[in-house]
Amino acid sequence: MSFMERHQVALYLGSMIVGVACAGLSGWSYASEQLVPYALGALLWTNFALMPLTGMSVGQYKRLACTVVLTATFGTPILVAPLVSLFIPEGGPVALAAVIVLLAPCVDYVVVFTRIAGGEYRGLLAATPYLLGAQLIFIPVWTSIYAYIGILDTRVVGEIFPLPAESYLSLTPLIVPLVAAYLVQRWSTRSPQRQQTYERVRSMSDTAMIPLMCLLLALMCSAYTPAVLNETQLIPRLAGLYLTYAILAGVAAWFLSRAMSRAERISVTFSAVTRNALIIYPVVALCAQRLAHNGNPEAKLMGATVLTQTLTELLIMVAMTAIFRAAFQDRKIPQRLPNPGTPKNIERRPPHTGRPPLYKL
């Protein structure tokens, strides 16, 4: 194990501290925000390059894929409803933004964190298309249900749906690296020389994964910290909401998946806790513009609502990675030694020496 692999959690925390420290520099926050999609795309490329995409099918991970999709579609909304009512009882644009981000399971860097923590990351990748499809279908359904039962303001929900077509462009940092990695793997199967070239690419991708994760964490903290700190009255409630959700969802996912293997349980737990804020943020920003155009003064708080979830989740992911690595990685299974004692009711026999036994005459 290399130096970066042994100390990656400390490197992640250090990167986040550097990003927060650089957030106050003039123009740095804006530049960092522009670079986040590219850093995310590079990180996902290195992750996808290490996976056997051409030989992967959802049938290999059917149980895991079904579990994470059903959890995201039906389990998470049951938990989100009372939490949003408790922390944001107003039901306005802030509550709507929180609901949208909490109902969207992560499909990008959750794969990276799961791999680092020792989970079954290939199963999460196989479930990615189904998680994306479930989000597109069920987020409008659940937000409408929340509005009907009084958790969200019906007027606010009615003003944002259907989602603008530009919102689907937010999937670009995910789809482009995935398709590129798949095409390169298909290309490498044509000849042994291409396979050797791809093996070198895999080796470089494995080496670059931790530095790219550090870069992404630093850029995200630098880009989003100023917007979050500007809303000092709102942040404690939002941070409490997201932290409470992460704890309850993580504990519930871990214990409800106890029939699975340890790697699958880690994957289910990470999938239940991690949200799709990087993909959802442009969508929420477009919804905020629509509400602001209609004269809603709270629309400007929707962006900070999503960004608070991002920063809170980064700390939670780093902590979860450290916990799982400390608890499970490099743990040696003790071997059961034979019992040296001999039961009293069993006759002791002399060891076999290769010669016939001597008997007294």
Protein language model features and the residues they cover:
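Alpha-helical transmembrane segments of multi-pass small-molecule/ion transporters
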Residues: 1-361
